[in-house]
Amino acid sequence: PSVSYTQLMGTRPYTFEYSTHAKILKDTSWIAEPNWIHIYYPYFDANVQLTYKPINSDSSVQDYLNDSFRLTGKHQVKATAIDEKILFLKNGNVASVSELSGEVPSPFQFHITDSITHFLRGALYFNMSTKNDSLAPAIAFIKSDLVHLLNTLEWNE
């Protein structure tokens, strides 16, 4: 598909540009918290789960970072490799991204924080069996969209 983006609208504590091939859906799971959303790609039947956490006196950014690495680490059983990178983004933010190889449920994950107020984690899932070799073109397309999301992310105060 061609590449074009639109601005996330609403009153969330974050905003970014996302693919016009995707739909924003509210997270309706029983554990969902305010400002958790899904970026759903109907063409690929893929979903990016975004979980937002405010950093406040009751929590710490270190707890959220540990949770993020722990959740990524759960895939080690099926992963043939986990490639972690730090991205220094055009908007001045810094993000950590993990690319997982093998028959893993989530081949791409990330987190980004300002270390003071905001923490956002994302994980890509496909609503089908994990045949990531055949999904490689879709994974690459969505990964590119997610890097664009990270480059355009702004925190709302």
Model-derived regions: residue spans:
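Surface-exposed amphipathic alpha-helical segments
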Residues: 22, 123-157
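Extracytoplasmic/periplasmic, Sec-exported soluble proteins
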Residues: 6, 10, 14, 114, ...
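Generic detector of well-ordered alpha-helical segments enriched in charged/polar residues
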Residues: 15, 62-72, 143, 147-150
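Short glycine-aromatic motifs
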Residues: 22-23, 77-82, 153
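Conserved polar/disulfide-associated segments of primarily extracytoplasmic proteins
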Residues: 28-121, 128-132
